[in-house]
Amino acid sequence: MQLVLYGLFLVFLLVWFLRTEGFTSSPGSLVEDIKNKKVLVLFYNKDCGHCKTLKPEWDKAEEVMGDKMVAIDVTDSSNEEVKTITTKYKINSYPTMLVLYNVNNTETYEGERTKDALVSYVQSM
């Protein structure tokens, strides 16, 4: 019985480590983190009502799409890194979703704000 439980535990650990996850980034490291990648980036403010509605759907989509999506918290507008990144990408309202390819803005996502719509869009990028 212990051997079976041990085996199940190992399988669980394997599944846990192999699952797809998004990656984390920050305003200061975004440019380096997405270098040579095409990703959908969410710029959000924790105090924004629309951001609070979107974030759970974003998180579900990010679990499926892994490193093709990243959310950047830009709540602290007094932070120099936040100022730099929001100026660079002309972020004036929240939430804003941009497709960035090799650090350059290629388009703004204007579609539905649901897990399925986000996943479908990212798969088509």
Predicted feature locations:
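Single-pass alpha-helical membrane anchors
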Residues: M1-G22, W58
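Beta-strand cores of modular interaction/reader domains in eukaryotic scaffold and signaling proteins
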Residues: V39-L42, V70-D73, T96-L100, T108
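Local sequence-structure signature of Cys/Sec-based thiol-disulfide redox active-site neighborhoods
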Residues: L30-K68
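Extracytoplasmic/secreted envelope proteins and their assembly/folding machinery
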Residues: V31, K55-E62, V82-T86, K115, ...
